[in-house]
């Protein structure tokens, strides 16, 4: 019998850029996130799907989402639970606004040390920045 696993999926809420309107950009040339609806990062949905498949293979396993963002980022935790996740963790504080990938990775790593998962799954990259750095930085 396989040991039950505590699986955590790193996920991000990103702006939905499929239907960008005239207010999508700020005068400074950055994305006006308030003007765009927010969605579950598609690459992270792939990670969630993989985690849920692993959960199904190993009796007693759990899947939780870990995300960092404003309070509305809790929407992707609810979405993940609708898809089969057992719960989630939201790191939220105004001080996190504008965090770069290193700061984000550090905050997520601190949370992971407290959560103590057996397996961590991350998507390839977020569609809003395309840096593909948070997963590898958390892995270090």
Regions found by a protein language model. Name each.
Residues 1-140:
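N-terminal glycine-rich FAD/FM-binding segment characteristic of electron-transfer flavoproteins
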